[in-house]
Amino acid sequence: DNADFRWGICLALNIDEISMNTFSGAGRAAPIPLMNNTQFLQETYTIPMQDWLENFELDLGDGTTFKPYDTGYAKRMADSLGIEGTDEELITMFGAGWWKHDEEAATKLLEKAGLEKVNGVWNYEGKPFTFEMSYLADTEFQEARGVQAAYNQLTKFGFQCSIASKSSATWDVDGGKGNYQIAGYWPSGGILKDFYSAISGFDGDLIKPLGETGSGQGLRWNNEKVTEILHELANTDPESDR
């Protein structure tokens, strides 16, 4: 549970290549990975957050900071696919932004998290740092291709990781209990105006320890402010403008 490690992994990945491998470039990037990035969700939340996202900074641990948000993704994908359009049209097609691919920043963050690259291999406490990446074997085939592309990139970047496919039944158990390390699967709920049911699992009062079936979100991300908001939403009329 280390934010520097997670950001290091994120910045080590090249979303352009992953998108080409997953959707042949036709996917809409979702910088806030809670739900599927529908046009409604993007226009209601992501686009109004652009200033905040563009000014968001990471502490690299060496006295410098880094702004990880990348607004150039839509234009790059359009250029690579030979698609023309206004900025607004390209954002509708490809998304408002994603996170930068920057191996130098990724390296600093991983070192800040306690890892060290030895002879091209990432080590932790003197041993190669290993983890498993998993995806669903019998459904969500685009997501499987995305995980496979990410696995190839992280292996090239120096991680001795493994990759595994799981049945939906196995993932239902493992996801609920937190029995995974890095996993790829589709979120849902972004098409709904009232998506409380899709995010209610982030209520800190419902989160269970690892090994116990959790509240509906395998991340076990616990934030006091979010819990307060969810408690308020639980008692808000779905037809309310709020």
Model-derived features: where do they sit?
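Short secondary-structure boundary/capping segments
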Residues: G25-A26, N36, N179-Y180, A198-F202
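Short helices/loops that flank or line small-molecule/ion binding pockets
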Residues: A3-D4, Q148-F157, A169-Y180
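Short, solvent-exposed loop/turn segments at the edges of secondary structure
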Residues: D1-A3, A29, G126, K177-G178, ...
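A ligand-binding cleft/hinge motif common to bilobed small-molecule-binding domains
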Residues: G189-D194
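Append "and occasionally in soluble cytosolic enzymes with long acidic Gly/Pro-rich linkers
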Residues: N2-N152
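Paired acidic/hydrophobic, glycine-rich loop segments that form the ligand-binding mouth/hinge
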Residues: Q181-W186
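Extracytoplasmic/peripheral linker and loop segments enriched in polar/acidic and small residues
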Residues: R6, S19-T22, F56-T92, W99, ...
